[in-house]
Amino acid sequence: MKFLDFFRANKKPSTASVAKERLQIIVAHERGQRSTPDYLPALQKELVEVIRKYVNIGNDDVHVALENDGSCSILELNITLPDR
């Protein structure tokens, strides 16, 4: 009987293999969207604390971004300072 099963075209994949494939797709998608490192929010918080020692700013006045350009990583820091 197994010999005849080889020629059948209506083979359905098992539910476990389908679930595994879907999970791999979801994990790969989430990894692609999580391009920012885990330390970036903590870095932004510490930068705000240091800048507050000298200038009165809010939490939303500091923006930190990390760009990966091939073999080079660029850390971009934008600070909105209040008018004097």
UniProtKB/Swiss-Prot annotation:
Key words of the record: Cell cycle, Cell division
What does the record list as GO biological process? cell division; regulation of division septum assembly
InterPro entries attached here? MinE, MinE_sf
State whether keyword Cell division applies: yes
One matching Pfam family: MinE
Q: Which residues form a coiled coil?
A: none
Q: Is the keyword Cell division in the record?
A: yes
- What protein family is recorded? Belongs to the MinE family.
HAMAP family, per database record: MinE (MF_00262)
Summary of the function given for this chain in its UniProt record: Prevents the cell division inhibition by proteins MinC and MinD at internal division sites while permitting inhibition at polar sites. This ensures cell division at the proper site by restricting the formation of a division septum at the midpoint of the long axis of the cell.
**What protein does this entry describe?**
Cell division topological specificity factor
Species name: Pseudomonas fluorescens (strain SBW25)
Q: What is the lineage of its organism?
A: Bacteria, Pseudomonadati, Pseudomonadota, Gammaproteobacteria, Pseudomonadales
